[in-house]
Amino acid sequence: MGESKRTEKTRVLVVGATGYIGKRIVRACLAEGHETYVLQRPEIGLEIEKVQLFLSFKKLGARIVEGSFSDHQSLVSAVKLVDVVVSAMSGVHFRSHNILVQLKLVEAIKEAGNVKRFLPSEFGMDPPRMGHALPPGRETFDQKMEVRQAIEAAGIPYTYVVGACFAAYFAGNLSQMVTLLPPKEKVNIYGDGNVKVVFADEDDIAKYTAKTLNDPRTLNKTVNIRPPDNVLTQLELVQIWEKLTGKELEKTNIAAQDFLANIEQMEIPHQAGIGHFYHIFYEGCLTDHEVGEDEEASSLYPDVKYKRMDDYLRMFL
């Protein structure tokens, strides 16, 4: 049933299309054969890279729709064009933090009344499991929960895509903070380095998102991205890199209390980052719960040949 449904063309609007994950979702939707629309907000007029991205989307076959979060009716008109809305609004402290702006999108979808599914901006840790998260990083999860509650209160059909660390931020650097490149000599290991973590290439996250958005099996469900070969400990990730380079790194184990020391004195974005790293690498928040095959992306869509972390790390050689 799911397979036949996904061969049909679905009209999709991507909001936040020029963002880090948004641009990948646009391309994945086009590759999946969806009739893809992207929301162009008037304020991007002087941002040359975003303008060029929109032009590249247009060249690939996407349709540009103008709309503004300060103009409710323009949002209603935009969502009336499509069956599915996917949001990729930024929700991290070191970039723009726009999670609650999605409430305006919820209102527009509610008024339009035609949208068959909404995928809000998620893609990371599962917010209902993060009520205990350290501030200020918890703000992201609290706000995502606020958006979820608004979606469900409005009776809008949904799919939540969660569960993985973006490889570019967590794998290429062997999970080191303050760099996106692999360390050359020394590597910090969180605790004993044996907590299981989920890594995923961002293009694969986008592919799974494009496949799940019209799949009846995932309607009103949470889809976890947990590709089995990419469920690794930090030590296993480091060992993959050491095998590729033929060089052993000097390892320094950092106890939890040392990792969190002086967090209150740090800048807010750094505090949030420390908190997220703590929950992932010390608590194991991505893997401390079971996920059924009908809830896991790589099981639902085995045709996606996801990138393993050894292949991912080869890019840095």
Swiss-Prot record:
Its EC number is 1.23.1.1, 1.23.1.3. InterPro entries: NAD(P)-bd_dom_sf, NmrA-like, NmrA-type/Isoflavone_red_sf, PCBER-like. Pfam families: NmrA. Belongs to the NmrA-type oxidoreductase family. Isoflavone reductase subfamily. Reductase involved in lignan biosynthesis. Involved in secondary cell wall biosynthesis in fiber cells. Unlike conventional pinoresinol reductases that can reduce both pinoresinol and lariciresinol, PRR1 shows a strict substrate preference toward pinoresinol. Active on both (+) and (-)-pinoresinol. Abstracts the 4R-hydride from the NADPH cofactor during catalysis. Forms homodimers. This is Pinoresinol reductase 1. It comes from Arabidopsis thaliana (Mouse-ear cress). The lineage of its organism: Eukaryota, Viridiplantae, Streptophyta, Embryophyta, Tracheophyta.
